[in-house]
């Protein structure tokens, strides 16, 4: 299963959604600012991040500015606090975030749009 966490008004996010639609690859869309994600999904996403929360948190969003979360201050927060913050406000994460599971386990993560890197998701159709 492939999940795309995105904002509908983001041009890069639209490219990602269009890529999957054009290649007839089924995705589950999660709209940042409207939808919520389970804590277990967030933990699975983090398990694919080399730098943990630093990989997925955007320090440029209105939410991070409002909460005074910077690349330095987030280090003072506990894992539980960061999980709660992100679960309560998905606007804290970078977008688009593409998360793939295989056999119900975390498998692949891509943040942003790269026309070459995103091609790897075409294999998802054949890996079922």
Swiss-Prot record:
InterPro entries: Arsenate_reductase-like (IPR006660), Thioredoxin-like_sf (IPR036249), Tscrpt_reg_Spx/MgsR (IPR006504). CDD domains: ArsC_Spx. GO terms for molecular function: oxidoreductase activity. Keywords: Disulfide bond, Oxidoreductase, Redox-active center. It comes from the Bacteria. Disulfide bonds join 10-13. Gene3D superfamilies: Glutaredoxin. Belongs to the ArsC family. This is Uncharacterized protein UU176.
